[in-house]
Amino acid sequence: MADGVIARLMSGGRGARSFYEELRGRDNVSDVDDRAGLLDEENLNQHFNDYDLENAEGLRLEDSRATVDGRIPRGRAQLSGRPPRPAATTHWGTSHDDDGDNDVPASLLVERYDRGAAPLGSPGKPRSQHAGSRAHPAPGLSKGRTHQQRPHIDQELQPPLHSDAAPSSLLAGAITGNAKKMAEWRWANITNLDSFMQDVYSYYRGSGMWCIVVERVLHLIKVAFVAFLLTFLSQCVDFKKIPSNQKLSQVLVPQCTRNMSGLWNIGLWLFAFYFMWKSIQYILDLRRLTHVRDFYIHLLNIPDEDMQTITWQEVVARIMVLRDQNVRTTRTITPQNQRWVLGSQSKERLDASDIANRLMRRENYMIAMINKDILDLTIPLPILRNRQLLSQTLEWTLMFSILDFVFDPKGQVHQEFLRSDRRGILSAKLRSRFIFAGVMILILSPFVAGYLIIVYFLEYYNEIQKNPSILSARSYTPLAEWKFREFNELPHLFKRRLDMSHPFASHYIDQFPKAKTSMVAKTVSFIAGSIATVLALISVFDPEMFLGFEITHDRTVLFYTAVFGAIWSVARGSVSEDNAVFDPEYALGNVVEYTHYQPEHWKDRWHSADVKAEFEELYKLKLVIFIEEILSILTTPFVLFFSLPKSADQIIDFFREFTIHVDGLGYVCYFAEFDFKKGSKSQAPAATAGEGDVRDDYYSTKHGKMEASMYGFINNYARNPKHLPPAMRQQFHLPPVFPGITSPTLAGDLAASRMGRSQRGRSKGPLPSRTPRPGAVMAEPSPMASILLDPRHQPIFPNNMSFVNTGHQFRGGNQGDGHMMGGGSMEEDVKGAARHGQQTHDDESEDSRAGLDESAWQVSPTKDLSRENSGRGLDSVVGEEAGNGAGVVHMLYQFNQAHLNRRLGGVR
């Protein structure tokens, strides 16, 4: 909507189609993936046309009929570029309605190994269905369905084509089917996993449905109270009458609402519009909250009472268990819809890394742009030309101008940004968005500044009056938070990491000697404290004089006692403690351990004044941050008008160069995949050493951001307990006698056992083996393996990459130069390994590009469904694999299921 308004304003109101409409239209018509060869049409087993979706019943493998008068839409035939052909018969001509046999045959399902399971449906019996039932029908909407009691949930591989398949209301769902069946049906028919995972995570951060509802109601009450209080004090009270009157009724302005100014009336109308809009939005959102609550209660077995205490890692684990219980269904769908599902909406990509990538898809790009200094945030004013300022106001405008422009409503990157020939027009449109955002900030700046000042004053005045020392409290600036934030780090995990660093950061700032400041502060505190003490003693002997005696005009003893008491508190807080020990290495070392931020020039200089000054720019007084936030409302338009348009070309190039496509996940930031090997391989064939260094700098992050992000991510989801002190954590776990189900070595063996004969014949390198060969770069089992990560995301380090050499050590270890980020980085180690072992690297890269069938522990995922094997049952396929020596895989699969159920308390 906003994009359309901008386009019409820029085009002068012409009736031509806007740029954003054309952008969305090109995304729907053409896909760059088709031209880039990201999808192998040859492996789809059958070629479908676009018009086959409307006549999908004729494509059933068990039945094929011709129709007498079958037609296809004219527009669709023209788009396909082929002459129209007779379509299959439609279900309108059928004389019977067999809803009981409306399910996918068991031969087309790849599900858990269960020999006792009854077959679902009859594959040899013809089926017919109504026009509006192509998507999964809601539970209870069809009569005589006996397959609703099955324990599994079918995964929808195409978006619902008709809305009448969904339940009409919650009441209808409650009458015709229980809440669990409704939750299962909604889970099976999710069409946007990014939006769904955002809802799940927002529900978790809000601590449940009722906490979210209470928070929203209190927000409306707070906003209404502020509007009423300001209107009453500014328009309905005559302050000139207060000295001569003793009652409130005597100073009120009669009919004050009729005498208000026009500007205040506009403000009240804007408030009324906001209040009504948010109220309607909250009421309509109750349905979505109810659906998410049912998902937590019935599918994840997490009641609302546990939402305030359960960890996010436990939620992810239960989502993975739900994913593993979900069978995969193949349907006769067009290649376009199949590309849509396999491209970004596969539920097999739902481990901890994939969920974080979906939640942080937009923020990862912002983290990378801040890290690589893509954005020019300098203030174009003579006195502040070399100063960068990132306020919340500027952050909101960046989200609107850049991210809302790059991403489509489905959360994917627009295809136009991946084409180099569209660089010029996209850069021009981005500059126009910057200018439009600057104009809107200029218009809204008086209202925003006034609102922030009033709310801040009402919220913190009493706290400052009771404890003036909080004026010296510090916090990280918004720019520092974006510099510290890591790829795939969720907001609540990032906040916890920063909160743990605050005591050490304050200790680092306070311990530096402040001789001159301490001497002045001691003198000021002595004088102010003496005057306050004298006034307090006088008030003890004569309380009436304390209240009525005026030291200056209209200023009593009480007033000056409060003033000098506040001065004494502030001055006393500026004095260094007498028993303070100067040890900046210890304090800043702990800060670096939690923030994971240490520029190269900070090493061996933690005690210097330059490092302290740089750190103070990142860790400022809260009062200074608030003043900068108010002033940024005035400086943000200048940044949007003059500084950021210079970065438009670099921003467009950044999204084109650092956007990759992951099957089942969609387009993500390159750094968020933690693919060190891929980056080193692409950078290896440089012409000269100088060119190689330039490319390495361009395709890598600064300050070891990607390496620190990977270690931080593994630390959040690994089995290493985080509630213990760092010195007591186990640095290495000895491998068990029988390899655990999360062991990377076992994952490699399972991948080898699941590899088909044709894949083994095309393999470039030797098959994985537990016995290392001399001179080969073998993957070592990582001590940080996690059950919340699929095998493709488990941390595996080659022999020539040392985990200790990266310098990541805990506080209990060595605290020398390599306290946190000493030694060579992982990116450099992997680049060196790629240059010395290209063949081995190619083999590992070939293994890492596994299909979506390897994203979950399956019994027989190597047997692709086709016309040749679709007629056979699942037992025959399993029998073939058992005959080929896959019985151990079944045993390990059962061991995995038992391990998961025991770990998650029997969640199924």
From Swiss-Prot:
| Ranges facing Cytoplasmic side | 1-216, 281-433, 455-525, 577-622, 644-908
The glycosylation sites annotated in the UniProt record are N259
Q: Is this entry keyworded Cell inner membrane?
A: no
Question: What topology does it adopt in the membrane?
Answer: Multi-pass membrane protein
Which intervals carry biased composition (Basic and acidic residues)? 839-852
Which Pfam family, an example, fits this chain? Answer: ATG9
Residues assigned to the Lumenal compartment are: 238-259, 547-555
| UniProt entry tagged with the keyword Oxidoreductase | no
The record's comment about this protein's domains reads: Forms a homotrimer with a solvated central pore, which is connected laterally to the cytosol through the cavity within each protomer. Acts as a lipid scramblase that uses its central pore to function: the central pore opens laterally to accommodate lipid headgroups, thereby enabling lipid flipping and redistribution of lipids added to the outer leaflet of apg-7/atg9-containing vesicles, thereby enabling growth into autophagosomes.
Instruction: Please tell me where the chain lies in the membrane without crossing it, as residue ranges.
Output: 434-454, 623-643
**Where found?**
Preautophagosomal structure membrane; Cytoplasmic vesicle membrane; Golgi apparatus membrane; Endoplasmic reticulum membrane
Query: What are the TM regions of this chain, as residue ranges?
Result: 217-237, 260-280, 526-546, 556-576
Which BP terms from GO are recorded? lipid transport; mitophagy; piecemeal microautophagy of the nucleus; protein localization to phagophore assembly site; reticulophagy
Q: How does it assemble?
A: Homotrimer; forms a homotrimer with a central pore that forms a path between the two membrane leaflets.
What family is it from?
Answer: Belongs to the ATG9 family.
Query: Could you tell me the superkingdom of the organism this chain comes from?
Result: Eukaryota
> What is known about its processing and modification?
Phosphorylated by apg-1. Apg-1 phosphorylation is required for preautophagosome elongation.
Q: InterPro entries from the entry?
A: Autophagy-rel_prot_9
Catalytic activity line of the entry: a 1,2-diacyl-sn-glycero-3-phosphocholine(in) = a 1,2-diacyl-sn-glycero-3-phosphocholine(out); a 1,2-diacyl-sn-glycero-3-phospho-L-serine(in) = a 1,2-diacyl-sn-glycero-3-phospho-L-serine(out); a 1,2-diacyl-sn-glycero-3-phosphoethanolamine(in) = a 1,2-diacyl-sn-glycero-3-phosphoethanolamine(out); a 1,2-diacyl-sn-glycero-3-phospho-(1D-myo-inositol-3-phosphate)(in) = a 1,2-diacyl-sn-glycero-3-phospho-(1D-myo-inositol-3-phosphate)(out)
Query: Where are the compositionally biased (Gly residues) regions?
Result: 813-825
List GO terms (cellular component aspect): autophagosome; cytoplasmic vesicle membrane; endoplasmic reticulum membrane; Golgi membrane; phagophore assembly site; phagophore assembly site membrane
Keywords on record: Autophagy, Cytoplasmic vesicle, Endoplasmic reticulum, Glycoprotein, Golgi apparatus, Lipid transport, Membrane, Phosphoprotein, Transmembrane, Transmembrane helix, Transport
* Official protein name in the record: Autophagy-related protein 9
Native organism: Neurospora crassa (strain ATCC 24698 / 74-OR23-1A / CBS 708.71 / DSM 1257 / FGSC 987)
Segments of this protein annotated with the region Disordered:
64-162, 751-779, 809-878
